């Protein structure tokens, strides 16, 4: 399904019964809406699900230039308006987590519960430099040189070495991500900070991450402690793309939190 919103055309998928609570899934950098296939299958009987390729990803348009999270948040609200979605729950991972943190701060009235996964919630000078290096590689040589370094960062070593099915799925998504989209969203990731204002968020929040997601795992524990009433689930034997490393555990925790 193609939806025009905020000046570009988004690729979207809608499933689940009409009249059920809306649940929006938001993808990570260099993936597309199909990263959520296991969760869509598990929850589509209980929720009206919107999955969309974020700006510059999958089959959504990929304008040139550097994007910001303000822009990515505006995209979501424009999509919701175009589809007459008054209010929805949110589940986002990595870049989708940061987008959700921005929405929780800018548009809390448009959302019910937030499930925020595998992100530190802010950039640092070091991570900013790393993103700029990756941007330079993509502009010079395309996405191919970024595939293996990315999957090695994202997946636990034993999962990567075994070449588990989810690794190949993600390899293909990274390789086929439009360069404009990668560059635009990587620029947003290089310069953002949603940590400072998260303690003021009133919506119910579940933080969820893999136990092997490096600094993001530690950051999620800190953010849970800083936001009164929020919950934390750490998935065992899971890395950055925790919903694919532990799909059944992830879907169960997601469903239980959204149904509380």
Regions inferred by a protein language model and the residue ranges of each:
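Short beta-strand/loop motif that positions the catalytic acidic residue
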Residues: 201, 207-209
């Amino acid at each position: 399904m193609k939806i025009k919103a905020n000046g570009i055309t988004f690729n979207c998928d809608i499933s689940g019964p009409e009249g059920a609570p809306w649940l929006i899934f938001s993808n990570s950098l260099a993936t597309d809406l199909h990263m959520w296939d296991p969760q869509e299958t598990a929850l589509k009987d209980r929720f009206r699900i919107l999955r969309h390729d974020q700006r510059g990803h999958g089959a959504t348009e990929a304008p040139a230039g550097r994007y910001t999270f303000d822009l990515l948040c505006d995209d979501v609200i424009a999509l919701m308006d175009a589809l007459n979605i008054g209010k929805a729950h949110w589940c986002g991972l990595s870049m989708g987590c940061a987008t959700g943190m921005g929405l929780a701060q800018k548009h809390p009235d448009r959302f019910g519960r937030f499930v925020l996964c595998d992100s530190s919630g802010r950039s640092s000078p070091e991570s900013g430099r790393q993103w700029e290096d990756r941007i330079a590689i993509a502009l010079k040589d395309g996405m191919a040189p970024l595939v293996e370094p990315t999957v090695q960062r994202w997946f636990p070593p034993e999962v990567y070495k075994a070449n588990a099915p989810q690794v190949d799925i993600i390899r293909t998504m990274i390789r086929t991500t439009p360069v404009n989209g990668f560059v635009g969203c990587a620029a947003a990731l290089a310069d953002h900070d949603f940590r400072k204002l998260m303690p003021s968020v009133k919506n119910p929040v579940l933080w969820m991450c893999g136990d092997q997601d490096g600094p993001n795992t530690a950051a999620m524990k800190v953010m849970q402690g800083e936001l009164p009433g929020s919950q934390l689930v750490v998935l065992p034997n899971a890395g950055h793309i925790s919903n694919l490393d532990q799909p059944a555990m992830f879907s169960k925790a997601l469903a239980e939190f959204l149904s509380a």
